[in-house]
Amino acid sequence: MALTFLLRGGSRNAFDGDRNTGQFPANVGHLCEQLWDEARLGTRRTVTCSQNAVQHASRVAVSAVAEIPVAMVRRLLHMRLLDSGRLFDQWWMIAVDGTLQDRGHDTQDGEARHRYVLTASLVGPHGMTFPLMSEFMDMHDPVRDKEDCELNAFRRLATRLRADFPRRPICLLLDGLYPVKPVFDTCETYGWKFIATLREGRQPSAYDEAVQTMMLSPSLRFLGQRKGEDGPVEQTLRWTHDVPFGAHVFNVLFSGEISPTSATLWVWVTNLRLTHERVYAVANHGGRARNSIENLFNVEKNGGFGLEHTFCANTQASQNYHLIMQVAFILWQLLAKGVLHRLTQACRKLTDVKLVELLRTSLLSVPVTSDAPSFGQLRFCSSA
């Protein structure tokens, strides 16, 4: 299942098309450390079809598979490989957002059931994002049901996140759906920090209060610059303190940006302390880092992983397929930013798509031998 996503065929049929070609069956056996029983299975080596994988996935508890990405990220944390990704060298940033998993089959009453998933991803160094947890939700009307379903899923996800990482200092990166009392209460109860996009229509009174008090504090201003896709982006950061959000009081940060092609205003509400020394990091290393989870969804949707593709109709198997997709994404991050990055440093324009093509060709054509050297260490920077 993991190879289905690592090789980015986008569907089960694409994987089945090559599964018994060339050196692929023997290489998969070597990689999985599985000996081929010729007496029982014959001399021709094969890889099981995806339908058998679906049958197996439909029998395995989703909660058990969900522990795999958590265990992988926990291992990376214990190895201290991700320490440089913390905000202010303290807060582990976790981006939370929902997306369409796939459009399920029509129900008996003729309505389409949409499978949505809420994902929590750890923001790492060097632009990496590691999917950590997923909460699944079904809805018939994405426009009408999305808010209630996603906020309820957030409550369940927050409970799991707290149980698995009770002592980690966490800062949640949230979109404009989340600046509401239940989310504020959860962060206060668990001692979490948060940076959430603030939309004018979501909290109109708080937004107006923030604008008015910001205009009365001209000294709370910082001029900065960041690197943009089209050239340098000039930033004007302004902020205000103690803005009431119902029973809570938070800080609001405004970021006006002018790039060579556009002008944009970003607004965030946060319970982090804002000062002249800290606002640049809060805006650029915190608030804007939430885009990493949208980039993750974009790669999984359009980069061959198959997010939004219906891999199977069985709900349990479909959820397990999605979780293994997250496992494959973590593995790809480690490969692409680790050993493959060092091996291909001379090829600056080598894309992930080309790397996947080379990996697929190697598995089909080059035998994996048992005497291949093992990896000595894992690192993301050649100078480390």
Tell where the protein language model's regions lie, with residue ranges:
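Short, conserved catalytic/metal-binding motifs centered on acidic residues
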Residues: 1, 15-16, 49-54, 90-101, ...
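Gly/serine-rich nucleotide phosphate-binding loop at the start of the catalytic core
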Residues: 1-47
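Short helix-capping/linker segments at secondary-structure and domain boundaries
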Residues: 6-14, 124-129, 330-342
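A short, flexible helix-boundary coil/loop motif
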Residues: 20-22, 29-30, 34-35, 218-242, ...
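Active-site-proximal, Lys/Arg-enriched surface segment
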Residues: 45-46, 51-133
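Electropositive, glycine- and tryptophan-enriched low-complexity nucleic-acid-binding patches
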Residues: 110-169
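Domain-level cores of phosphate- or acyl-group-handling catalytic modules
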Residues: 144-205
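An anionic, glycine-rich sequence signature occurring as long contiguous blocks
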Residues: 193-293
